[in-house]
C-alpha cells in the first residue's frame, strides 16, 4: 500500500513538473503501470499507454518521459498516432514515436502516415501536428 502511494505521489509531481517546464499545454499520460526513477529524471509507463495532448492522441505498449531531454519516447507493435484537429486530420504508426516538448513528432521504424488522401511510408517521418508540415527520410 505504501508503494502505491509513492507511485501516485511521484506521478503527481511528474505531472506538475511536465506542465511547468514544457510548452506543451496539456499532456495526459495513462497506463497500467508507472515507474518513476528520480535520479535519472525518467518516468516509465507500461501497458495500455495512452497519451493525449492538445493536438494528438498516441497509443502504445510503453513510453519513457526523459525530463532532461524533454522528450517522450513511445514504443509499440506498432505505436499509433492520430490528430485531434478536424482541419488538420492525419493518422499514422511506427515502431517508435518521439514526442518532443514543442509537440514535434518523429515516427521511426516502419513509419507510415496518412493525410489528405496521401500516404507516406518511410523509415523516418518528421512532422509538426500544429502546422501539418511533414518530411521523410528513406
Question: For the regions a protein language model found, what residue spans apply to each?
Answer:
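N-terminal amphipathic/hydrophobic interface segments
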Residues: 18-138
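Sec-dependent N-terminal signal peptides
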Residues: 5-14
Amino acid at each position: 500500500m505504501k508503494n502505491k502511494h509513492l507511485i501516485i505521489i511521484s506521478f503527481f509531481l511528474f505531472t506538475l513538473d511536465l506542465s511547468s517546464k514544457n510548452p506543451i499545454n496539456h499532456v495526459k499520460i495513462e497506463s497500467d503501470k508507472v515507474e518513476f526513477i528520480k535520479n535519472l529524471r525518467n518516468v516509465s509507463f507500461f501497458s495500455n499507454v495512452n497519451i493525449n495532448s492538445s493536438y494528438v492522441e498516441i497509443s502504445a505498449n510503453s513510453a519513457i518521459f526523459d525530463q532532461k531531454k524533454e522528450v517522450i519516447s513511445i514504443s509499440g507493435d506498432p505505436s499509433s498516432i492520430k490528430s485531434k484537429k478536424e482541419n488538420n486530420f492525419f493518422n499514422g504508426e511506427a515502431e517508435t514515436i518521439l514526442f518532443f516538448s514543442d509537440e514535434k513528432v518523429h515516427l521511426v521504424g516502419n513509419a507510415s502516415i496518412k493525410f489528405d488522401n496521401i500516404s507516406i511510408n518511410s523509415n523516418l517521418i518528421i512532422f509538426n501536428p500544429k502546422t501539418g508540415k511533414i518530411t521523410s527520410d528513406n
